[in-house]
Amino acid sequence: MLLMMDVKDFHLINEFWGYQMGNEILHYVCKRLEAFPKVVLAGRFHSDVFVAVIDVSGEDFDSCRQLIDKNNHMIASEVLENYPIQYFSMNTGIYYDLNREENTEKIISHTNTARRKAKEQVEGICAYTEELQQAELRRADVLHSFQSALEKHEFLLYFQPKISGKEAEITSAEVLVRWQRSDGEIWAPDRFIPVLEECGKVEQLDFYVYEQAFQWMVKQREQFAGEITLSLNISPCHFRNIEAFTKKLLALIEEYSIDTRYLIFEITESAYIRNREAVNQMIDIMHQYKIRISMDDFGSGYSSLNTLKDIAFDEVKIDKRFLDGSLTEKGRIVLQEIFHLLKRTGKSIVCEGVETKEAADFLIQEGCDELQGYYYYRPICMQEFEEVVKVKNAVPLSV
C-alpha cells in the first residue's frame, strides 16, 4: 500500500510560527511515519508532502484505513503536545493494491490524486478508485479545453423564462450556460462550473456570458418593441475584488448601451452569508447605476426571516425546496408568512421550481410577482427563446 500525505494548511504554520518551526514539525512527522507499523519505506516527497510504502499482506482495506486514521490522530496529538501550534491535521491519499499491473509513475500519480481529494473529506482520508480517476480526467479535460472553448464560442446561452403572476406572460428570463463540446454533446453546468470555480477560471466564463447576453439584448431591442429583463448570476469569486468586478461590468454595460432597468444580478443566499460585507458593498455600487440585485435560493438553509428586513436586495428568489412534493398546509403557511414580510419590506418575489398547476395557482393567489419552473418552461436555447418571446409577447416594430 502506498500512502501520500500532507499537512493541512501548512503554509499557515510557516506564516505564523516561522519556517524554522515549520521544518522542525516536518522532520518530526517524517520520523513518526518511519515508525508506522509494517512500514517498508517512508520519507519526505516534497514540501510538506510525505510518502510511505506499507506492507499490508493479510490485511483488508477497512483495517488498513482504521490503522491510518489512528496513526494520523496519534501524530497530530504528539505535534500539538510538543509544539505551541493550536491546530494540526493531515490529508492522506491511499493506493491500496500495489500488485496491480501499473508502473510506478502512474501509481504515484493515482495516490496523489487521492491525496488532493482527501482535502475535501471530513476525515482527510481518500483511497484511489477508478471512479476517482475518471473524475480527475474529466477535471483535466475541462481545464485543458476551457480557453479554446471560449475562443470557439462553444459556451451557449440558455434561457429559463419567468412568468408574471399578474399578466401570466413572459416578463423576464434567467440566463444560464451550457457547453456544446466539439463532438456535439451538450454539458450541463454541474459538469464544468465547480471545476472552473475551484481553479479560478469562472470569472472569465461569467464575463463571456454577460457579454453574450448584452449582445442579445441589443439584437432583440432592434427587432422587437419592448425589452425582456435578464437575470444574470454572479459567482462568489467576484467578491474577492469588488472594485475590479464592478468596474469591468459597468464598462461592458456602457459599451453595449444597456438600459439597467432591464438587468437583475442574482447572488445566492449562501454566497451572501459567507461574504456579507462584500455583497452589501457590491449592492451599494450596483444601486448607484439602477441595477437590481436578487437573493437566489432563499431558504436553502442559511437565512432566517429576521434577516430579510435588513438586507438590501431588491428581489428575493424563493428556493424550490419550498415547493418540493405537494404543498402541505404547513408549507403554505410558511410561504404566506415569507410573502407577507417581503411585501411589507418592498421586495419583489420570485418562486423557482414551480412544477405543478396547484403550486402555480397558490403562488399567484398569494401575490408572487414572477414564477419560474418546468410547469411553464425548462431552460431553452437562444433560438427557441426568441421564438417563444416573439409569439408570447413581442410586437414587431413594423406594426
Protein language model annotation of sequence segments:
Residues 1, 44-55, 80-116, 121-129, ...:
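A short glycine-enriched loop-to-beta-strand structural element that forms part of the catalytic core
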Residues 1-2, 8-34, 43-47, 51, ...:
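Conserved long alpha-helical elements within nucleotide-processing catalytic cores of c-di-GMP signaling
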Residues 30-34, 63-82, 209-219:
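Alpha-helical scaffold within the catalytic cores of cyclic-nucleotide enzymes
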Residues 30-59, 291-295, 347-348, 357:
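Conserved helix-loop-beta segment at the catalytic/binding core of cyclic-nucleotide signaling proteins
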Residues 55, 182, 235-240, 262-276, ...:
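EAL-family c-di-GMP phosphodiesterase catalytic domain
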Residues 98, 104, 113-158, 196-200, ...:
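C-di-GMP signaling machinery
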Residues 138-195, 233, 295, 351, ...:
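Active-site core of bacterial EAL-family cyclic-dinucleotide phosphodiesterase domains
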Residues 165-174, 199-279, 353:
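Catalytic core of bacterial c-di-GMP phosphodiesterases, primarily the EAL and HD-GYP domains
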